[in-house]
Design a protein with these regions (language model features):
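Active-site beta-strand/loop signature of hydrolases that rely on acidic residues for catalysis
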Residues: 45-79, 102, 109-110
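A short, hydrophobic beta-strand-centered structural micro-motif
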Residues: 90-119
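Acidic/histidine-rich helix-loop elements
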Residues: 26-35, 87, 154-161
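A short acidic, glycine-rich active-site loop
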Residues: 81-96, 161-164
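Well-ordered, non-membrane alpha-helical segments in soluble/globular domains
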Residues: 30-46, 88-96
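Active-site-proximal beta-strand elements of phosphoester/diester hydrolases
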Residues: 12-33, 61, 141-144, 173
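Active-site catalytic loop in hydrolytic enzyme cores
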Residues: 116-174
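Surface-exposed, active-site-proximal loop segments in enzymatic domains
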Residues: 71-83, 120-131
Length: 174
């Protein structure tokens, strides 16, 4: 066995993965997301400080809606209004905030929120999962394909031609 194969065949050192469910306040304006970010920050600090005692925390997953909540669904807001006034861009200010936490704790942070994808359509938002690496960078982003009936998010299938033009039609595009 060569040294590269030996290195990859070694067991992964034990680590902790945390799933955090925070209280998320509904947002009436994009600036209100900051309150939810501060709550997430406090909970991450507390959870990591308690958990890091036994093993390093390498993955933190936030509950769906932790940043943006579900205001658009609760109040049945028009899609364009919600996209223009409420939801984030990935990457953007909010991912930079979370990126600082990922760097601080040398961990991955997994987030789900409503986000615009201006590279696809600037007046639409998607129920988006993204992953921030320990260097604080967004390394993965995906749009939810199957929505709950009350969800107003756009899906790749709603704008199929534009999506395929940008990402292709392979299974990895969806």
């Amino acid at each position: 066995m060569n040294s590269a194969a030996q290195k990859t065949s070694q067991p992964v050192a034990p680590y902790m993965a945390l799933g955090l469910s925070t209280i998320a306040c509904g947002i009436a304006d994009r600036k209100h997301i900051q309150h939810n970010l501060e709550t997430v920050e406090d909970v991450i600090h507390a959870a990591v400080s308690m958990t890091n005692i036994n093993m390093p925390v390498k993955v933190i997953a936030l509950a769906e809606g932790a940043l943006t909540g579900f205001t658009d669904e609760i109040f049945d807001l028009p899609h364009k209004l919600a996209a223009d006034e409420l939801f984030i861009d990935v990457p953007g200010e909010e991912t930079e905030f979370l990126g600082r936490l990922a760097k601080m704790y040398n961990t991955y942070i997994i987030v789900q929120c409503k986000a615009r994808w201006p590279e696809i359509m600037d007046d639409r938002f998607f129920n988006t999962l993204f992953i921030i690496d320990p260097d604080g960078q967004v390394v993965h982003k995906a749009a939810k394909n199957h929505l709950w009936c009350r969800e107003h998010s756009c899906t790749p299938h709603d704008i199929y031609d534009r999506w395929v033009e940008h990402f292709g039609s392979g299974i990895d595009a969806f």
